[in-house]
Regions:
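Symmetry-related core transmembrane helices of the 12-TM Major Facilitator Superfamily/SLC fold
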Residues: 89-96, 176-195
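Transmembrane alpha-helix termini and helix-breaking/packing motifs in multi-pass membrane transporters
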Residues: 70-75, 102-103, 160-180
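Helix-loop boundary and gating motifs at the non-cytosolic
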Residues: 2-62, 228-235, 239-241
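Glycine-rich segments within core transmembrane alpha-helices of 12-TM secondary carriers
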Residues: 61-66, 143-170
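Cytoplasmic membrane-interface "Motif A"-like loop-to-helix N-cap segments
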Residues: 74-91
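Flexible cytoplasmic inter-helical loops of multi-pass small-molecule transporters
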Residues: 195-217
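Cytoplasmic helix-loop-helix junction between adjacent transmembrane helices
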Residues: 119-154
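C-terminal ends and interior cores of transmembrane alpha-helices
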Residues: 87-108
């Protein structure tokens, strides 16, 4: 029995699965910084409930990320490879935007906070795009299930750390310091990106049509009823708002 347990756990302890787990973790942190922790901060600063309600729109980049996702398929920034180079860019952007958000003053300028929170969400959504592509290309078809489980576990841990962990820290530190502390998590993300290997099967689409239009049409052609793909797309668009 013990051997069976060990054999079932071993795949999760492989290097690429631990990297997938870590990428899930750094992907889960920014989301709660713009939702749970930000709402608590706004409430403590006396921002009106109607204004706080409008901050739900900050999550729109997560739903609209398909608009700029093709950029990450067509442009390679450095010799590190297409996926890792974009991961570094998005993680540096997250560090800058999270720190900037923490330095803002909600009671003095809520609009400035909203803009910075949207930039955090944009950087986070962009990181999610690249991580999803990296995971799909670096794992074999047989490893996708374990990889997805590892990613979701890491994502939940990251979200818990940013949400519950951030609120606990806010009892002892200022919100500014909490955001600065949370931004340091992205340095762990940079470390993971540097030790990760660029996917070997990394074929770049020949054109925008091949990358976006053809897969989109093929997705609709799979289903007899138009309502099924429409419902799937609506779920993808709305589930993080």
């Amino acid at each position: 029995m013990i051997k069976d347990i060990i054999s079932s756990v071993n795949p999760y302890l492989e290097k690429k699965m631990l990297i997938t787990l870590s990428m899930g973790f750094v992907s889960g942190v920014p989301l709660l910084l713009t939702i749970t922790l930000l709402q608590a901060w706004l409430t403590d600063e006396g921002v009106s409930k109607s204004t706080i309600g409008l901050f739900a729109l900050v999550g729109l980049p997560y739903s609209l990320k398909f608009l700029w996702a093709p950029i990450f398929d067509h442009i390679t920034l450095s010799k590190l490879g297409r996926r890792r180079s974009w991961l570094i860019v998005t993680q540096i952007l997250l560090i800058i935007t999270i720190v900037s958000l923490g330095m803002a003053n909600p009671s003095m300028n809520a609009m400035n906070v909203a803009i910075l929170a949207t930039l955090v969400a944009f950087s986070s959504a962009s990181q999610d795009i690249v991580i999803d592509a990296y995971r799909r290309e670096s794992l074999t078809d047989e490893e996708q299930t374990i990889g997805a489980s590892s990613y979701v576990l890491g994502y939940r841990i990251g979200a818990l750390a940013a949400g519950a962990g951030g609120l606990i820290l806010a009892d002892y530190l200022s919100y500014q310091m909490v955001y600065v502390f949370m931004s340091s998590v992205m340095f762990y993300g940079l470390f993971i990106t540097f030790i990760a290997e660029e996917p070997k099967h990394n074929n770049q689409p020949s054109s925008f049509v091949a990358a976006v239009y053809n897969p989109f049409i093929e997705f609709f052609n799979r289903h007899v009823s138009l309502s099924i793909p429409v419902l799937i797309l609506l779920f993808i668009l709305l589930y993080k708002i």
